[in-house]
Amino acid sequence: MNTTGYDILRNPFLNKGTAFSEAERQQLGLTGTLPSQIQTIEEQAEQAYKQFQAKSPLLEKRIFLMNLFNENVTLFYHLMDQHVSEFMPIVYDPVVAESIEQYNEIYTNPQNAAFLSVDRPEDVENALKNAAAGRDIKLVVVTDAEGILGMGDWGVNGVDIAVGKLMVYTAAAGIDPATVLPVSIDAGTNNKELLHNPLYLGNKHERIAGEQYLEFIDKFVTAEQNLFPESLLHWEDFGRSNAQVILDKYKESIATFNDDIQGTGMIVLAGIFGALNISKQKLVDQKFVTFGAGTAGMGIVNQIFSELKQAGLSDDEARNHFYLVDKQGLLFDDTEGLTAAQKPFTRSRKEFVNPEQLINLETIVKELHPTVLIGTSTQPGTFTETIVKSMAENTERPIIFPLSNPTKLAEATAEDLIKWTGGKALVATGIPAADVDYKGVTYKIGQGNNALIYPGLGFGLVASTAKLLTQETISAAIHALGGLVDTDEPGAAVLPPVSNLTDFSQKIAEITAQSVVNQGLNREKIVDPKQAVQDAKWSAEY
C-alpha cells in the first residue's frame, strides 16, 4: 500500500476511518488526521445506523447510505449485512426509482461508475480503464437505461440501477466490491422531461439507434473483454428492441447475462416451482397467461418454455401452453408490430370461436381458464376482482404473480389476491409485501425480486471462472431456489424471504459453480467448486 495520508481517507476501498490502529496511523501518515479514540467496526456500524435512523424520508436514507459507501465501502457492507432486509428496498428496488427520477437534483459521487458517451466512442477503453483505476474487475453491470424499472427511458440517471445491482451482489453473495464496475452507456434519451431539464447530466439529444448504436455496443464489449478478460458482463434495463439482440449476439462467446430477460424468467420460474411444490401440481399441466409481452414478459415465457422442453415436450407442445397479452389484447400471428421474441408464441385466430373479442384481460381469462397469471405490464390495478375470481373458479390453486414495480405500477396487491380467492391464490409480487392475515392463516408473500437469484448465480460464475452461462447452469440455479419452500407451513411463501438472502445465495453460487465445472466451462482448474466459492467470498471486515 503506497498511498498515505488523506489519499487513504479519500479512497473508499482503503479507508477505515476511526478504526485505523495507532500503528497504522503512524505508518500511513494519518497521525493527527483522525480523533484519538480508535473504534471497532462494530462501534462504527452502531454509530452509522443511528445516523441512518435519523434520516427521513426513505430517499434521504438512501442518500446517506450512498455517501457512506463513497467514504468507507467495508463499513457500508458491514452495516448492510446486519440490516439486509431493511436496506435492500432502499439500496435497490423500490427506492432506487426515486433516486433515478431525481438523479440530477441530488447528484452524489457516482460510486466508481464508468460513464461511456456514444458521442465519444474513441474514449470507451480509456474511460473503463480510468474507472477501474487498476482494480482487477471480475463483474461489470452495464445499463443504457432505456427501460428502467418499468419507468421507461431515464438516460444517464439510470446508472443508479447498475450501482444498486452491484451492491446487492456483494451484500447477498459476497463478491469483492473492489472487483466490480457499474457502467452507464449514455446513448442519449427520448425522455423529453430530461432533455428540457437544465440540470440533466447526460447527452442532451435523442437516443441513437440501429447500426450506430450496435457498433458502439460492440466497441464497448471489445474494450471490456480486452481490459477484463475473465469478467462476467451483466446487462441491465436495456430497451425491448435491443436487449434480446445484444444477448443473442454475445451469449455464445463470452460469460454474459441479461437480468431482465434471463433473471426475471429465472426468478418467476423458481416461484412457480415453489407454488407447484405447495399445490403438488406439475409444470406441464399449467396454462400461462402473460400480461405484458415486453422484455421481462418474454424473458419469463422463454425460461418456462425451455423448462417445458427439458420435461420432454416438443417445441410446438411447449409453445401451446402460452398466451401473450399486450396492449393490443391477445397476440395473434397477424398482430401488427410483433417483436422477434413474441412471434414464436403468438396464437392463430382459427383456434378461437370469437378471436375479435379477446382484446381485454377479463375476457381472455374468462375464455381461456389459465392456471398461471403473470403481470409485467406496469398497468396498475389491472388484475381486478372479477378477473381473479374467474381464475379461482377454474383452478384449485391459481398462481398469480403481479410483478410490475415500483409500487404504484403493480397489477394488484397481495392482500386483495388472497381475499378475492378465499386464500387459494399462490402469490408472488414484484415489490416487498407484508404478510396477509386471512381467516386464521398468515400468508407470507414471496417477492419475485431478481435479487433472490442473480447474486448467487453471478458469484458462482465468477468463482468458477466461467467462460459461458448455459441453459443447463440456469436451470440448476432455478431448481436450487425453487426447492427452498416450506411446503408443510400453512400460508408458506412461494419464494424464500430476503432475510435469508445470504444463506441461499451461497447455495445457488455453489450449485452454479458445480454446473460450470461439470460442463468443463471453467477457465482455471477447479477441484472442489464449493471450496472455490468459499475461497472467493469477501467479508466486510477490516
UniProtKB/Swiss-Prot annotation:
One BP annotation, GO: malate metabolic process
EC number: 4.1.1.101
Protein activity control: Oxamate, fructose-1,6-diphosphate and L-lactate act as non-competitive inhibitors, whereas succinate, citrate and tartrate isomers produce a competitive inhibition.
Binding site for substrate: 165, 450
Residues reported to bind NAD(+): 293-296, 405, 450
Activity-pH dependence: Optimum pH is 4.35.
Membrane-traversing stretches: none
Cofactor names: Mn(2+); NAD(+)
Residues annotated for Mn(2+) binding in this entry: 236-237, 260
PROSITE patterns hit by this protein: MALIC_ENZYMES (PS00331)
Pfam families (alphabetical): malic, Malic_M
Keyword Lyase (UniProt): yes
Active site, UniProt feature: 92, 165
Reaction catalysed by this enzyme: (S)-malate + H(+) = (S)-lactate + CO2
MF (Gene Ontology): carboxy-lyase activity; malic enzyme activity; malolactic enzyme activity; manganese ion binding; NAD binding; oxidoreductase activity, acting on the CH-OH group of donors, NAD or NADP as acceptor
Family (UniProt): Belongs to the malic enzymes family.
Protein name, per record: Malolactic enzyme
Taxonomic source organism: Leuconostoc mesenteroides
